[in-house]
Amino acid sequence: MNHLLRRCRSISYVGLIITALIAILIGFLAGFLARKVIAESKIKSAENLARTILESAKKDAENKKREALLEAKEEIHRLRSDFEKEVRDRRGELQRLEKRLLQKEEILEKRAESLEQKEILLEQKQKEIQQLEEQITLLHKKQLEELERISGLTQEEAKSILLESVQKEIQHDMAVMIKEMENKAKEEADRRAREIVGLAIQRCAADHAAETTVSVVTLPNDEMKGRIIGREGRNIRTIETLTGIDLIIDDTPEAVVISGFDPIRREIARIALEKLIEDGRIHPARIEEMVEKAKKEVDNMIIKAGEEAAFEVGVHGLHPELIKLLGRLKFRTSYGQNVLKHSIEVAHLAGLMAYELGADASIAKRAGLLHDIGKAVDHEVEGPHVMIGAELAKRYHESDAVVHAIMAHHNDVEPQTIEAVLVQAADAISAARPGARREALEAYIKRLDKLEQIANSFEGVEKAYAIQAGREIRIMVKPEAISDDELVILARNISKKIEEEVEYPGQIKVTVIRETVAIDYAK
């Protein structure tokens, strides 16, 4: 029984499942059919919408097509009008050009006719000229034959005589013209040179203090002399040994004289002695200490002097060793003229003259400042100061133009640049101007007397005067004894004898004057 009940239950379950499956299937079919109906409805709606859009688009396209056709027709009409107008304008222009061409053709035809007439006239004139030339040639030939018959000379001989006469006349005229041009050129060159030198000297003012070979140190009292001498002279010996100078202690009240030909050593001794006097402690150890301090102080003074000189002239970029050598020139003199001051003056003069002539003023100033740099070491190195200075400039990378100007400033080599010539001239101006250099009075008087004696020793000399502080000698000659042509020879002979017998700085101008005076009286 239980088995039957279980079987009945299982049958009922299967029925229920089948019923559920059938219901699901029916629901699925119903949903499918409903969706199909809805989809078909949407498709129909979309088709209707598409047809509506298509019809609307067709209408719009037809409208735009009609508008485009209208616009195209209007554009074609406008272009046709413009083209027709342009054609009309071109046609009018062509008609005007054609008219002008016709007018030009008429003018050309008239000119051609005129040219034909002129050609005919020219041919006639040429024939007439040819006939005249033939007549002239015939007459010329007859004249030459007649001249040859009268003069007894052939045509070639007459030509030769005429050419020789003309050549002599032309040579004479050329000689006169060349001499006039040379005189004018010399006068202009002298005038311009004097003007340039005058301007340079006016714009350059330098003061010079004559240097001596001694320095004087003032003492607070005469007792200090004994302390300077020291026990058994040990202090004075120490000072002289360390500085290389002579210390002169004499009866001069409250003063000690330092003597020496090396200005740097003399300056070191002066500074050291002044410091010792101020300190009051004078003994060999203290003297050695003060001399070392004085040496450092003088070294600083030398560098400062070199820098100030370069700055004053406007020269930059000098090697430090050249700066030191420039500073050493402050303690050097030449004929009583301070060499550093002289170098500054030469640099200024050379630069000013270079500006006036349009030359390189920077090279002229640089070479002028360094031209005597060899004098800073020439007592320590063998050789002339010119060659030493050029070697130093080359060693410390100065330009070839500067080195050449240094080498040429005393004519050791021929100056090849205008800057070298200007440095040479500036050096001569600075050295030769009155007051720049001094000599002993006795030597000065002897030199002037010697100059006049040399001039008077020549035959034909009437008077001789040494002027311009011995830098010029003016000689008056007897006109009956010396001719004008002999003046140049006499001046040269006197110059050569002066060069051989007289020592002098710079140069001496020899002027020989011959004067003839004729006197008569009107009655």
From Swiss-Prot:
A GO cellular component annotation in the UniProt record: plasma membrane
Q: Which PANTHER family match?
A: RIBONUCLEASE Y (PTHR12826:SF15)
SMART domains from the entry?
HDc, KH
Membrane topology per the record?
Single-pass membrane protein
Name the CDD domains for this protein. Answer: HDc, KH-I_RNaseY
UniProt-annotated location(s): Cell membrane
What Enzyme Commission number does this protein have?
3.1.-.-
Keywords associated with the record: Cell membrane, Endonuclease, Hydrolase, Membrane, Nuclease, RNA-binding, Transmembrane, Transmembrane helix
Transmembrane helix found in the keyword field: yes
User: What protein family is recorded?
Assistant: Belongs to the RNase Y family.
**Single annotated GO MF:** RNA endonuclease activity
Question: Where do the KH domain residues begin and end?
Answer: 213-276
Keyword Oxidoreductase applies:
no
First-tier enzyme category under EC:
hydrolase
- Pfam families documented for this protein: HD, KH_1, RNase_Y_N
User: Which InterPro entries does the record associate with it?
Assistant: HD/PDEase_dom (IPR003607), HD_domain (IPR006674), HDIG_dom (IPR006675), KH_dom (IPR004087), KH_dom_type_1 (IPR004088), KH_dom_type_1_sf (IPR036612), Ribonuclease_Y (IPR017705), RNase_Y_N (IPR022711)
Query: What is the protein name stated in its UniProt record?
Result: Ribonuclease Y
Source species of the chain? Caldanaerobacter subterraneus subsp. tengcongensis (strain DSM 15242 / JCM 11007 / NBRC 100824 / MB4) (Thermoanaerobacter tengcongensis)
Which residue ranges does UniProt annotate as crossing the membrane? Answer: 14-34
Any idea where the HD domain is?
Answer: 339-432
Job description of the protein? Endoribonuclease that initiates mRNA decay.
